[in-house]
């Protein structure tokens, strides 16, 4: 069989007892192990586009002498072509069905992921978010909610890597955050607990960057804690940008780390939290948008309602001809 596959031609061994010694010894060895007697052999490769996808292997003709003749070789050679095409077409059809089924399953995962993201509230709500996946599923997530007494919680995260593995870790991290953030009002303690859980279960080499916070509209304060996430931008009422750079390592790397939180005065300003898909998106020449480019879009639409503002910013970024290869996620918190 191997010789037929390598040479890509039909081979007949008329009588193994009279043919070349190595072939005879090969079949005699098999016969001794199986109690079968080999008299004659036909092997024809199945060729599609000059590639061997298999071999038809025939033993012993159903005649008295059990020996294949040259006409048998020619017949098998003729039949092998259509057989190869039929087998290849069947395989392609199965692959297409499997691919369509997997694509449908991925789309379902994508739809489930969308339900994990907070929905924007259009009337006087200080927080809005947007997520545009690079593919059907995303490795980014955000969440925000009203905690009561003028307080609002929010979180943005980016899972390392891309694809299904990243989206599954994202789903776990977002579910943990949604559950724990309802009862924990310390940003640092919440990160500590999330980190412990992710360290126990995340696949080796995977991690999550995350920034979480609480906005107190009565005290006009921001409580922030950062686990290796992109430094957020604060756009103040006087038109200047302030950077919050304090951060610990990403979640899932160091199980014993203790995260710190910072309290900032926050009045008549906007906090922009985003993933690196925003600042690292490139134009046709390979130039990244970077922080300065993002700031220009913020300035352009700052006086637009927050949910419209984010849509316009992302729309402009994509319309500028930049090529999206990563998820785009932004959350804005507007201070009163």
Residue map of PLM features:
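Acidic/proline- and glycine-rich, intrinsically disordered low-complexity segments
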Residues: 1-17, 244-247
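Signal-transducing coupling segments at domain and membrane junctions
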Residues: 14-40, 61-62
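A short, aliphatic-rich beta-strand micro-motif
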Residues: 39-48, 54
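Amphipathic alpha-helical "output/dimerization" segments
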Residues: 48, 66-88, 171-175, 267
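Short beta-strand-to-loop transition segments that serve as allosteric relay/switch motifs
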Residues: 55-66, 159, 336
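Active-site-proximal, acidic helix/loop segment immediately C-terminal to a metal-coordinating Asp/Glu
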Residues: 69, 164-184, 242-245, 268-321
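Short alpha-helical interdomain "coupling" segment at the junction between an upstream regulatory sensor module
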Residues: 71, 85-104
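… and, occasionally, acidic/histidine-rich disordered N-termini of signaling adaptors
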Residues: 97-272, 322-336
